[in-house]
Amino acid sequence: MIPVRCFTCGKVVSTAWKEFKERRDAGEDPKRILDDLGLERYCCRRMLLTHKETVEDLNPYQ
């Protein structure tokens, strides 16, 4: 689950997650993707760069 907003500045970042993930999985440079998506602040960029999907890891413990 990607956070809806940046923890630091509050900008909406969840709208960029799907395209970022698809393009990164295709092997494109993350810097270029984030630039194309208009994420200029480093706080917003780190929200996508450092995100790890953990929902599937936690499901067995419910």
UniProtKB/Swiss-Prot annotation:
Cofactor: Zn(2+)
GO molecular function, one term: zinc ion binding
The UniProt record lists the keyword Transferase: yes
Residues binding Zn(2+), per UniProt: C6, C9, C43, C44
Documented EC number(s): 2.7.7.6
One family name in Pfam for this protein: RNA_pol_N
Alphabetically ordered keywords of this record: Cytoplasm, DNA-directed RNA polymerase, Metal-binding, Nucleotidyltransferase, Transcription, Transferase, Zinc
Protein localization: Cytoplasm
Disulfide bonds: none
Superkingdom of origin: Archaea
Catalytic activity: RNA(n) + a ribonucleoside 5'-triphosphate = RNA(n+1) + diphosphate
Subunit record text: Part of the RNA polymerase complex.
Function: DNA-dependent RNA polymerase (RNAP) catalyzes the transcription of DNA into RNA using the four ribonucleoside triphosphates as substrates.
Protein name in UniProt: DNA-directed RNA polymerase subunit Rpo10
Source species: Methanoculleus marisnigri (strain ATCC 35101 / DSM 1498 / JR1)
Lineage of the organism: Archaea, Methanobacteriati, Methanobacteriota, Stenosarchaea group, Methanomicrobia
